[in-house]
Every structure is written in C-alpha cells, then in structure tokens.
Amino acid sequence: MANKLFLVSATLAFFFLLTNASIYRTVVEFDEDDATNPAGPFRIPKCRKEFQQAQHLKACQQWLHKQAMQSGSGPSWTLDGEFDFEDDMENPQGPQQRPPLLQQCCNELHQEEPLCVCPTLKGASKAVKQQIQQQGQQQGKLQMVSRIYQTATHLPKVCKIPQVSVCPFQKTMPGPSY
C-alpha cells in the first residue's frame, strides 16, 4: 500500500513539474558589445552615414551629457527616477518652451530617417558614456549612464519624431567595458 501511495505521489509530482515547466518560457537576448562588433550600434549602413553627416548628433550629445551630470533634483527637464519630459510635452505653448539645446537636438533628430533615429541616438549615447568615462567621473557613474540611456530612450517621443516613440535600449550590467 505504501508503495502504491509513493508511486502515485511521485507520478503526480512529476506531472506537476512537467506542466509547471512548460508554463514558463525563458527569453535570452544577446546585447552584442558594440566595441567588438565592427558595425557598432549601426546595423544599417545608411544609419552610420547619417550619423556621420549629422556630425554625430552634437546637440543631442550635449543634451545627454547635461542630463547625465544633473542630479535628480533639478527642474522638470531633468530626470527624477522616472522620466519627467512627459509633463512638459503637454505644454500647450509647444516646442518653443523647450530649452534651446533640447530644441537643437530635436531638430537634429527630425533630419534623420525614422529608421535611423534609434541607432544614431545609441551612437550618441555611447559617445557621451565614453566622454564621462574619460573624464574620470567615478562618483555616481552608474546613475549617469542610466540617465543617458533613459533620456535617449524617450527623446523621440519628446521631439515628436514621426513613426518613433521610444528607442528600446537594453539595460546592460556595468562591466569593464565602461
């Protein structure tokens, strides 16, 4: 009797584990290191050319750098944990109320092909991240890098880029490649 009870229990446990395992699905995403990938952030050659012609989105780089260096306790155009641009986007006075540097960045992004907006923003973000690294900014570096990519992620929405609302940059763990 104990043998049958054990066999039934083991069978039920096996089926439970089998059905439970089939419910969950693991998604593995590879974030290639752009430093070792010759294409870098530009999977589309046309985007690399646009990035170079746009002088590497200089105004956007300056805006990203400014946002990275500010703490979360600034005006509404800075980051405070979550993205604060959305409150200002609904300003009925429109884009003329944007800070001039942000407006220049938006102008640069509007000149890009919609397909290239995110790759060029990723290139600009990487350039800013490297600038911060070269400046030797150790204090709060992880937060600065996070603010760079968080700002860049939402810039298409802030700038009202057609066909692009956000750039889905993957968050990567900090490593020696900083």
Swiss-Prot record:
UniProt-listed SMART domains: AAI
Domain of life: Eukaryota
Signal peptide as annotated in the record: 1-21
Positions of the propeptide segment: 22-38, 75-94
Pfam families reported in the protein's UniProt record: Tryp_alpha_amyl (PF00234)
Tissue: Cotyledons and the axis.
SUPFAM superfamilies: Bifunctional inhibitor/lipid-transfer protein/seed storage 2S albumin
Classification via InterPro entries: Bifun_inhib/LTP/seed_sf, Bifunc_inhib/LTP/seed_store, Napin/2SS/CON
Transmembrane segment boundaries: none
Gene3D superfamilies referenced in this protein's UniProt entry, alphabetically: Plant lipid-transfer and hydrophobic proteins
Keyword Kinase: no
Keywords: Disulfide bond, Seed storage protein, Signal, Storage protein
Gene Ontology MF terms in the entry: nutrient reservoir activity
PANTHER family: 2S SEED STORAGE PROTEIN 1-RELATED, GENOME ASSEMBLY, CHROMOSOME: A01
Oligomer and partners: The mature protein consists of a small and a large chain linked by disulfide bonds.
Family: Belongs to the 2S seed storage albumins family.
Job of this protein: The small, basic, water-soluble napins are one of the two major kinds of storage proteins synthesized in the seed during its maturation.
Protein name (record): Napin-B
Naturally occurring in which organism (per UniProt): Brassica napus (Rape)
